[in-house]
């Protein structure tokens, strides 16, 4: 029930429907099932929309309408009396939040239109108005709100900023690291610290590897609930726990025993084959069979009696026994077919080999790890202290501050918990533990609504942990009192051809071990409508593989990259789709796993005339050729003795010196100087005093004179003009901006150059001046291996899309090509010198000196890199986590398709059959095989091989070079031009002619009334003043910038410690202060400070206000005393609107504005306006604002029918307040 007030001030009572009971929900589900609607909601969607009063986890498969469910649930909450501002709604991205807000807005508009109840219309309109302020956004955005509001409770200023530029973060990190490193190198424990650094960097002079270790540990800790506690309690967890054989986890022992038993079983299956040859010709057992039987029996016995025969303490002995028992090779051959029976067991034995030796040396590395722990803790504290001093933070800092505020302030936490009716989270599978902690603190324990799909968790590199979702899923299924699980399985996006192949692939591939979830009936995709089940034979999924048996060398030098032949296969299929099926290019999307090596795709498509749009590559703005040329030009202007920059400038198209020219210049050396720079040689060459003046011919001399004259001009201008103007002078003097327009990718190149000028302008606006500072900033960015954001140019709409799989998440496309399926998964992380784990902490490779173990006496040391036991445990978990994420990445890619999916790769046709043992061992591919295969393509081929008797809903085809000839690929069909002899074309031409006549008439009408067309409906006095101002004073031409949105892409690192206060902000604050200042009290500093607290401005602006000057106005001027004497007649910040007639078009328009102050008496009016402009003589401002005050006076006269007898300007921009009568 809600109370509103009607026009008479009487209360209106709105009665809302109660939330639905479980019985009512079942009744609604039945009604929906029996209804004749074309698009019905599923029973699970209805349950997810209307269930209330408990925690709910919605597991929403791809295309199941999760956004629809969220919007409908939010609307239902609103219709049942829950205000939108009482819902916390978290989305993964800002874009998702914007789309969700728009959908809610459209729903509210629709509901208002349908509602006949006046009271409900008023309520829904209020909800619509509140939508902009509702908590719908990312967790980062919400955390910023909390810290801005309550940061004072933990000593954090509300006036902070976010360091979004990685370059700025790296510069600060480097400063903190260097200082701390120096301190640790000179402390008491310095020898241990040096050993730590050498373990990772090899020596103490090169600290890059150790610095990477520290940064990674710091970054990893930031994703935990409490970084400091994690570093103190969990960082060395595995190092403290796993020190003996007995400490090895039972799970790892079980995996070893399982591998032994599986090997025995597989070997038995092989020996039972008809062609194996158990018996000799004489009828006795063959030697091979006898040996294999012994292996089978012993492996089975050791597995069965492990605890009695070995136990954990005897694990090292077991490893030696098994290693001695089985052959060194992996395969058993039967009838020329190789079966990799022993491969998995060999891999497991390798993991446990040399355990005793490793454990013996592992204890020596513990002091090093303690030093590392101390360093990372100290780094975290010092880095945070610097950020607090700068009042500039990373997003993770702000979230941790928000968590700290809620944990340490019970009243604040309870106020949020009481305020939010429900805490809703989208993409829950991609949350990390820091975000989970924040959500827990906001919830009252039974009002969480979480939507996600663990099969689409693909952001592990952002420390997202799918196990958060998984744990909730298990808990709610086992303990229903904790919450409810609702499965959305129906897919409303894809045709059955896509759904069937997805189910076939992942039912054989995904389980808890690899993928983190068993792909069973609970998770399989089901068509949501009958139309999706209509079969299309030509849309069957295709695995198209370029046969690399006779590779023509088209593959890139890195074997991981996509080859020209693979791209040609894609081009051929697209041409076929476009020509034969009429599929528009924008319906086709190419998905790749990374942005690297995509240039070959664009190049090949250009050859075939296929338009393509990419989502961008790695940030390479500063490495683009045109920008590098300009940067070297600026470096040369700053310091001509920089040989590298000077050579780059001379070789650039601006001056076009060739190798011969440079060689001749280089020989003009002064023999008396040891070091001679190129610039000096040029100067000597020009005056003929070089070592070989005869080499400088007239043409070269002319070029050198032009260069020196131009450079001198630029250097002189750099001292006087702005960076922006200098860059444009370079463009214009040497026509470089025009030159790049004639090159490939001209639009992008010109946009890059334009952006450079804008970035230079922004740099100077931020308070820095000069060429040297700008170059230094750019070089700092490059030193930290970073770059500036790329410049986006308008892309064609009718084009094939190329994007990463990550970028495609949440989107859908009719036809999807998954490219480079033969690319190996990146396993770089599992080969690093350290591996981090949330539970186990850090595991490292230890550089041990085994000189004593070997009995070596001649060498000083014998260093061996050992994988410590914690490292091995973390490595195994990381390997499985990596494979699981790659599997989910494939799921995301496949489920983007609406109609058809293609897999593109390359393989040797003759060797592709050797991928797997075709013996079917169950519903899933064997775990060992899934761990062994490291490409999408290998997974698909293994499934096709092992489950060949099933319909897997995809075909495997090998493409030969003969299939990729120009004739075989074909060409795009272009639309036929109009035939003037065709009557239909002639009729169409007549229609176009009539349309052109109509356009001509409209154009003439527009010309006649051009002044009225361009006349704004509403204008302000400031706009009218601007029309007169150019006639009154000389002004400069401002720099044209496209839009504020484009400028945001060009943000430079913010190194300034002081926030620059704009003059407009000071003026706005002064007007607010003069509005709220109580004139009934004596005007003094205290009165002004009290009033200052009430205005809505940041602290920097408030500090910039000169309160003494304001006090002087009221105390020392007659007008200020007039304010206090006649305060009852005073009106402040008064809006007005009058009708005016434009003198040119004679059309009427509305003039609106706000008058700072006026005094209304019985027979006259006194007008006052405050100005904070800087000035030399008051007469300047009198002329500038005379027209504006006349408009104000006219408005007051029209309104009150009284004359304005006095008009005053109060000038606050000088040394003291001055009053000017206008």
UniProtKB/Swiss-Prot annotation:
Names of the cofactor(s): Mg(2+)
E.C. designation(s): 3.1.-.-, 5.6.2.4
CDD domains: DEXQc_UvrD
Ranges for domain UvrD-like helicase ATP-binding: 39-495
Pfam families per UniProt: PDDEXK_1, UvrD-helicase, UvrD_C
Binding site for ATP: 60-67
SUPFAM superfamilies for the chain: P-loop containing nucleoside triphosphate hydrolases, Restriction endonuclease-like
GO molecular function, one term: double-stranded DNA binding
Reactions this protein catalyses: Couples ATP hydrolysis with the unwinding of duplex DNA by translocating in the 3'-5' direction; ATP + H2O = ADP + phosphate + H(+)
InterPro entries assigned to the protein according to its UniProt record, in alphabetical order: AddA (IPR014152), DNA_helicase_UvrD-like_C (IPR014017), DNA_helicase_UvrD/REP (IPR000212), P-loop_NTPase (IPR027417), PDDEXK-like_dom_sf (IPR011604), PDDEXK_AddAB-type (IPR038726), Restrct_endonuc-II-like (IPR011335), UvrD-like_ATP-bd (IPR014016)
Family: Belongs to the helicase family. AddA subfamily.
Protein name, per record: ATP-dependent helicase/nuclease subunit A
Gene: addA
């Amino acid at each position: 029930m809600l109370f509103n007030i009607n026009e008479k001030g009487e209360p209106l009572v709105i009665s809302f429907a109660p939330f639905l009971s479980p019985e009512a929900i079942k009744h609604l589900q039945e009604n929906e099932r029996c209804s004749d609607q074309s698009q019905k909601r599923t029973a699970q969607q209805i349950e997810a929309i209307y269930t209330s009063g408990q925690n709910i986890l919605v597991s929403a498969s791809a295309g199941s309408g999760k956004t629809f469910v969220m919007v409908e649930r939010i609307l239902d909450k609103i219709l049942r009396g829950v205000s939108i501002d009482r819902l916390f709604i978290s989305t993964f991205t800002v874009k998702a939040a914007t789309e969700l807000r728009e959908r809610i807005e459209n729903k509210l508009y629709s509901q208002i239109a349908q509602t006949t109840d006046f009271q409900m219309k008023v309520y829904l309109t209020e909800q619509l108005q509140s939508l902009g302020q509702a908590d719908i956004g990312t967790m980062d955005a919400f955390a910023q709100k909390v810290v801005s509001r309550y940061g004072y409770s933990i000593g954090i200023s509300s006036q902070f900023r976010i360091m979004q530029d990685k370059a700025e973060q790296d510069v600060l990190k480097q400063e903190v690291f260097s200082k701390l490193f120096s301190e640790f190198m000179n402390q008491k424990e310095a020898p241990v610290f040096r050993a730590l650094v050498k373990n990772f960097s090899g020596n103490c002079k090169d600290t890059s590897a150790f610095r990477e270790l520290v940064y990674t540990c710091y970054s990893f800790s930031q994703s935990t609930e409490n970084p400091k506690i994690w570093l103190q309690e969990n960082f060395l967890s595995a190092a403290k726990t796993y020190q003996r054989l007995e400490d090895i986890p039972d799970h790892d022992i079980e995996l070893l025993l399982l591998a032994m038993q599986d090997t025995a079983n597989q070997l038995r299956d092989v020996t039972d084959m008809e062609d194996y040859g158990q018996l000799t010709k004489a009828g006795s057992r063959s030697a091979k069979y006898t040996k294999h039987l012994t292996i089978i029996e012993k492996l089975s016995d050791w597995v069965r009696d492990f605890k009695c025969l070995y136990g954990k303490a005897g694990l090292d002995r077991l490893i030696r026994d098994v290693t001695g028992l089985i052959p060194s090779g992996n395969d058993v051959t039967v009838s020329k077919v190789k079966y990799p029976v022993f491969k998995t067991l060999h891999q497991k034995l390798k993991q446990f080999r040399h355990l005793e030796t490793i454990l013996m040396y592992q204890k020596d590395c513990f002091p090093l790890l303690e030093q590392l722990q101390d360093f990372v803790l100290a780094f975290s504290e010092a880095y945070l202290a610097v950020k607090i001093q700068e009042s500039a933070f990373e997003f993770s800092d702000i979230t941790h501050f928000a968590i700290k505020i809620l944990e340490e302030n019970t009243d604040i936490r309870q106020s949020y918990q009481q305020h939010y009716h429900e805490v809703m989270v989208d993409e829950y599978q991609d949350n990390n533990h820091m975000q989970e902690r924040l959500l827990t603190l906001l919830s009252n324990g039974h009002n969480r609504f979480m939507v996600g799909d663990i099969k689409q968790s693909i952001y592990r590199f952002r420390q997202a942990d799918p196990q958060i979702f998984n744990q909730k899923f298990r808990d709610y299924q086992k303990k229903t009192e904790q919450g409810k699980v609702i499965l959305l399985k129906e897919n409303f996006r894809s045709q059955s051809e896509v759904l069937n192949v997805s189910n076939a692939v992942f039912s054989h591939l995904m389980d808890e071990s690899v993928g983190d979830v068993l792909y069973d009936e609970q998770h399989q995709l089901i068509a949501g409508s009958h139309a999706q089940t209509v079969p299309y034979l030509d849309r069957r999924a295709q695995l198209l593989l370029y046969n690399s048996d006779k590779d023509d060398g088209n593959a890139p030098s890195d074997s991981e990259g996509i080859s020209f032949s693979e791209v040609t296969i894609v081009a051929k299929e697209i041409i076929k789709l476009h020509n034969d099926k009429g599929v528009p290019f924008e319906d086709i999307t190419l998905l790749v796993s990374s942005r690297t090596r995509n240039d070959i795709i664009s190049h090949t498509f250009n050859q075939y005339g296929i338009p393509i749009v990419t989502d961008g590559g790695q940030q390479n703005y500063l490495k683009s050729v045109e920008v590098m040329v300009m940067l070297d030009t600026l470096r040369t202007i700053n310091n001509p003795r920089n040989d590298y920059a000077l050579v780059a400038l001379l070789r650039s198209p601006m001056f076009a010196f060739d190798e011969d020219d440079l060689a001749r210049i280089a020989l003009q050396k002064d023999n008396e100087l040891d070091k001679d720079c190129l610039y000096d040689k040029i100067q000597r060459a020009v005056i003929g005093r070089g070592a070989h003046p005869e080499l400088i011919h007239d043409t070269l001399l002319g070029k050198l004179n032009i260069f020196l004259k131009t450079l001198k001009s630029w250097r002189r201008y750099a001292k006087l003009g702005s960076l922006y103007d200098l860059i444009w002078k370079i463009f214009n003097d040497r026509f470089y901006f025009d030159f790049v327009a004639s090159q490939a990718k001209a639009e992008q190149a010109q946009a890059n150059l334009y952006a450079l000028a804008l970035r230079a302008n922004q740099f100077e606006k931020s308070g820095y001046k000069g060429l040297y500072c700008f170059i230094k900033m750019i070089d700092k960015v490059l030193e930290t291996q970073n770059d500036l954001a790329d410049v986006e140019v308008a892309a064609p709409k009718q084009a094939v899309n190329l994007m990463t799989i990550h970028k495609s998440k949440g989107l859908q496309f009719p036809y999807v090509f998954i490219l480079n399926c033969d690319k190996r998964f990146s396993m770089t992380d599992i080969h690093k010198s350290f591996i981090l784990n949330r539970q186990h902490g850090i595991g490292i490779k230890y550089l041990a000196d085994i000189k004593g173990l070997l009995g070596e006496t001649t060498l000083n040391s014998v260093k061996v890199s050992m994988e410590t036991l914690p490292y091995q445990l973390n490595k195994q978990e990381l390997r499985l986590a990596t494979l699981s994420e790659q599997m989910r990445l494939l799921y995301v890619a496949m489920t983007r398709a609406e109609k058809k999916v293609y897999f593109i790769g390359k393989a040797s046709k003759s060797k592709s059959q050797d991928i797997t043992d075709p013996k079917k061992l169950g519903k899933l591919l064997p775990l060992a095989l899934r761990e062994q295969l490291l490409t999408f393509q290998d997974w698909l081929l293994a499934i096709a091989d092992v489950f060949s008797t099933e319909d897997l809903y995809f075909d495997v085809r090998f493409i030969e070079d003969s299939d990729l000839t120009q004739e075989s690929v074909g060409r795009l069909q272009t639309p036929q031009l109009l035939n003037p002899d065709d009557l239909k074309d002639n009729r169409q031409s007549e229609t176009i002619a009539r349309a052109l006549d109509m356009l001509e008439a409209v154009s003439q009408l527009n010309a006649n009334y051009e002044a009225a067309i361009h006349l704004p409906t509403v204008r302000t006095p400031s706009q009218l003043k601007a029309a007169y101002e150019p006639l009154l004073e000389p002004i400069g031409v401002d720099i044209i910038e496209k839009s504020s949105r484009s400028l945001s892409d060009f943000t430079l690192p913010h190194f300034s410690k002081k926030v620059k206060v704009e003059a407009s902000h000071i003026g706005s604050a002064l007007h607010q202060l003069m509005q709220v200042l109580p004139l009934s009290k004596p005007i003094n500093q205290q009165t002004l400070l009290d009033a200052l607290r009430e205005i809505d401005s940041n602290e920097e602006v408030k500090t910039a206000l000169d309160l003494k000057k304001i006090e002087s106005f009221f105390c020392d001027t007659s007008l200020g005393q007039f304010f206090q004497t006649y305060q009852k007649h005073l009106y402040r910040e008064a809006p007005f609107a009058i009708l005016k007639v434009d003198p040119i078009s004679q059309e009427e328009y509305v003039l609106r504005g706000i008058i700072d102050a006026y005094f209304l008496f019985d027979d006259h009016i006194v007008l006052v306006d405050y100005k904070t402009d800087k000035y030399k003589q008051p007469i300047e401002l009198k002329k500038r604002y005379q027209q504006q005050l006349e408009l104000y006076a006219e408005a007051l006269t029209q309104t009150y029918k009284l004359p304005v007898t006095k008009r005053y300007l109060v000038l606050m921009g000088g040394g003291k307040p001055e009053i000017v009568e206008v």
